[in-house]
Amino acid sequence: MSTEVSPATAWSLAFLTQLVSSGIQHLVLSPGSRSQALALAADALSQTDPTGLQVHVCIDERTAGFYGLGLAIHTGVPTVLLCTSGTAPAHYLPALLEAKHSGVPLIAVTADRPVELRGVGANQTTDQVGLFGVGVHASIDTPAPEANNRLFDGAAARASDLFRLAMSGAKGGRPGPVHLNIAFREPL
């Protein structure tokens, strides 16, 4: 049995570690298969330092969005909303719009299929790139991490950028929501 870590797992751990280092305290998880690397990394981080990241599991994405909004209002720090691919991300939109209008920092992280599996008619595939439109300050689509590529170097930088954008807005304005769509290849 191999103990090698998949690129998805390594990238997810680097990304979430940097978000926690930036000040993230809460992550609201709506689990699914495509987001499992991120979910497992979040769980590992919360187990390593129970005073650091708190992971809240919420099966319904719409409820998760508003729960995360409440946490961000209460703490004044961005809360991460994390879900799988398909129709799941669409349920975040009402909470993201509330966050934008209220100046509340939220970071929506959506797992997605790699680019070669998008738009091919697979079950529940949804075009997640730009899904939230004007409801977020910024929307970023990240290619699937692969072994031995420079994307690992960019995971921490991407996390820092998202935190900054959520706190100050994409154009230096007020806090609000941002979206990161991350493609993952199998093995997840």
Task: Indicate where each model-derived feature is located.
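N-terminal alpha/beta PP-like core and its mobile active-site loop of ThDP/TPP-dependent enzymes
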Residues: S2-L188
